């Protein structure tokens, strides 16, 4: 097990805030190596929020502290796994759990290890990993102990070596893929089965979209067996293009309802620098499917709560034919480890950025989170396009008015010049006529003078 140096620091800080008898449990976040089956990278951790006591008076509801391992609410932990799993990009997964305990002997108490094994087995069904890691931190000694388990071991915990690396996140590359998809589905009588819908989507992606696609990294077609850091040296961010035959839409049948997926879906995955390129493709494909699934999960919950569906019909969502276009939640990119690795959240059509801040603070206990980017909605894009079109029209109209004005000015100038030319020509003609008249008079005067001199 290779862990980030920040994990030990975080465990020490959180241990100092706990009372001596209390226990803290949380999730380990990282990546399993595809090359080495025995190697797992643990990048960070998320403490599980304390459950709240249910009382009639909301003001008296208080967090329930964990006094023993057996008092841990397993269902609460599993629900937390579901929530966190949605917020992780491709390649980043829940790789295990950690506990801050009073003393290392706590694990040896009766039934405690058995409880942890059962908890890890339940988590394994959610994240579907090859193995799971378990880290315990003793408040008494300040030491970290590492164990691992998997299904072949029947989830029995076995000790494992822990290697600490400073800034482990710097050994990871980010993969980015922009995928434009509008999902079109037909419903019978305005009802859609939620589970069938998800199955259809996964089948469409895996059997149609991905099978007939070609993946390029940095506009290059590369062998899947190459080590990614050797092929792309000195790069920490790589762009992936997914070339498919049909990119505009995914359709199961003739259209009745449109699920607007914001035109461009920004998919992200992270991969350790020593992994193979085929693993990078696997992680980015996983993020594409996971992103669409998560959006439908959230949309289903929103529609169900609005429609007040009966308990007997929880799997179906009722759609209104008056609103054939449903906007899927938008993805929000949130900074997590420095500026290297991010997590995500989703904003519903009625959600605000304040909702996102609250979820991050309450669920992940990240104070003052930094949001890197938010997917723009299609409506906003349309509005922007309309504004651009209006601006273009205004510019065209202004251009036409300007041209018309210029033409009028040119015409006026031409008329003026024509008048000036005409006036000048008239003046010149008048002057010429006057000259001719003077010459004729002068000749007549000379002829009269000559006559009187010689004949009279």
Curated annotation (Swiss-Prot):
Lineage: Eukaryota, Amoebozoa, Evosea, Eumycetozoa, Dictyostelia
Gene Ontology CC annotations of this record: membrane
Function: May play a role in the trafficking of a subset of G-protein coupled receptors.
Segments traversing the membrane: 436-456
Membrane topology: Single-pass membrane protein
Name of the protein: Protein odr-4 homolog
Family recorded in the similarity comment: Belongs to the ODR-4 family.
Signal peptide location: none
One annotated GO biological process: protein localization
Sorted UniProt keywords: Membrane, Transmembrane, Transmembrane helix
Ranges of Low complexity composition bias in the record: 374-401
InterPro entries: ODR-4-like (IPR029454)
Region named Disordered: 374-403
Subcellular location: Membrane
């Amino acid at each position: 097990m290779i862990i980030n140096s920040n994990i030990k620091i975080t465990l020490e800080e959180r241990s100092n805030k706990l009372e001596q008898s209390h226990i803290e449990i949380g999730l380990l976040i990282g990546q399993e190596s595809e090359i080495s089956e025995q190697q797992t990278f643990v990048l960070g951790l998320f403490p599980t929020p304390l459950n709240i006591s249910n009382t009639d008076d909301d003001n008296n509801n208080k967090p329930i502290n964990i006094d023993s391992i057996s008092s841990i609410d397993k269902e609460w932990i599993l629900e937390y796994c579901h929530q966190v799993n949605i917020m992780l990009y491709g390649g980043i997964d829940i790789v295990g759990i950690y506990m801050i305990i009073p003393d290392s002997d706590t694990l040896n108490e009766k039934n405690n290890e058995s409880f942890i094994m059962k908890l890890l087995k339940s988590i394994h069904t959610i994240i579907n990993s090859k193995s799971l890691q378990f880290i315990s931190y003793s408040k008494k000694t300040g030491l970290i102990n590492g164990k691992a388990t998997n299904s072949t071991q029947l989830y029995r915990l076995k000790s494992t070596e822990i290697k600490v690396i400073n800034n482990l996140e710097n050994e990871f590359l980010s993969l980015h893929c922009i995928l434009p998809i509008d999902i079109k589905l037909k419903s019978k009588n305005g009802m859609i089965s939620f589970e069938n819908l998800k199955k259809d989507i996964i089948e469409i992606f895996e059997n149609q979209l991905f099978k007939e696609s070609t993946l390029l990294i940095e506009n290059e077609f590369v062998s899947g067996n190459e080590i990614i850091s050797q092929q792309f040296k000195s790069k920490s961010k790589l762009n992936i293009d997914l070339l498919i035959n049909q990119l505009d839409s995914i359709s199961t049948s003739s259209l009745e309802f449109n699920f607007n997926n914001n035109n461009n879906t920004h998919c992200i995955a992270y991969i350790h620098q020593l992994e193979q390129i085929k693993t990078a493709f696997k992680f980015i494909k996983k993020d594409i499917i996971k992103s669409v699934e998560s959006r439908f999960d959230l949309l289903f919950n929103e529609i169900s709560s609005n429609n007040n569906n009966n308990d007997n019909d929880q799997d179906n969502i009722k759609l209104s034919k008056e609103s054939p276009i449903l906007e899927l939640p938008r993805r929000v990119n949130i900074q997590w480890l420095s500026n290297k690795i991010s997590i995500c959240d989703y904003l519903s059509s009625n959600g605000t950025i304040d909702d996102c801040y609250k979820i991050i603070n309450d669920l992940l206990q990240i104070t003052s989170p930094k949001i890197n980017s938010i997917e723009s909605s299609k409506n906003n894009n349309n509005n922007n396009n309309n504004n651009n079109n209006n601006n273009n029209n205004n510019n065209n109209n202004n251009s036409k008015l300007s041209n018309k004005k210029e033409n009028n000015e040119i015409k006026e100038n031409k008329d003026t010049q024509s008048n000036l030319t005409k006036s000048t020509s008239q003046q010149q003609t008048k002057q010429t006529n006057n000259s001719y008249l003077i010459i004729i008079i002068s000749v007549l005067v000379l002829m009269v003078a000559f006559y009187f001199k010689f004949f009279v």
